[in-house]
Amino acid sequence: MNPVNYLYLAALLFAIGASGVLVRRNAIVVFMCVELMLNACNLALVTFSRMHGNLDGQIVAFFTMVVAAAEVVVGLAIIVSLFRSRHSASVDDASLMKL
């Protein structure tokens, strides 16, 4: 398969994730869309790494996945805390957490 097709797929995944972040109000769905955008960037990094014949992009993508795993833990903890206090997972309620 042509490597350019992987870049098109990465752009499509990023666009889907960006539209989900802009349109949705549920914090879990927004969080999943952010992760989709992050995985699209990883796919582009690995594709460019493969096209240029070095491992730099793959190493960066690996470390990005490690950081994303930590982000998932912290992000879901915040969402669960928001849900327990407000009984809703809406991002509009997140601004009320400071009260």
UniProtKB/Swiss-Prot annotation:
Transmembrane annotation, as ranges: 3-23, 28-48, 59-79
Keyword Electron transport: no
InterPro entries, A to Z: NADH_UbQ_OxRdtase_chain4L/K, NUOK/Mnh_C1-like
Bilayer disposition of the protein: Multi-pass membrane protein
A molecular-function term among this protein's GO annotations: quinone binding
EC class (word): translocase
Stretch forming the signal peptide: none
The keyword Iron is assigned to this record: no
GO biological process terms held by the UniProt record: ATP synthesis coupled electron transport
Cell compartments where the protein resides: Cell membrane
Keywords for this protein: Cell membrane, Membrane, NAD, Quinone, Translocase, Transmembrane, Transmembrane helix, Transport
Reactions mediated catalytically: a quinone + NADH + 5 H(+)(in) = a quinol + NAD(+) + 4 H(+)(out)
Cellular component GO terms held in the UniProt record: NADH dehydrogenase complex; plasma membrane
EC number of this enzyme: 7.1.1.-
NCBIfam families: PRK05715.1-2
Oligomer and partners: NDH-1 is composed of 14 different subunits. Subunits NuoA, H, J, K, L, M, N constitute the membrane sector of the complex.
Reported function: NDH-1 shuttles electrons from NADH, via FMN and iron-sulfur (Fe-S) centers, to quinones in the respiratory chain. The immediate electron acceptor for the enzyme in this species is believed to be a menaquinone. Couples the redox reaction to proton translocation (for every two electrons transferred, four hydrogen ions are translocated across the cytoplasmic membrane), and thus conserves the redox energy in a proton gradient.
UniProt family annotation: Belongs to the complex I subunit 4L family.
Protein name: NADH-quinone oxidoreductase subunit K 1
Gene source species: Streptomyces griseus subsp. griseus (strain JCM 4626 / CBS 651.72 / NBRC 13350 / KCC S-0626 / ISP 5235)
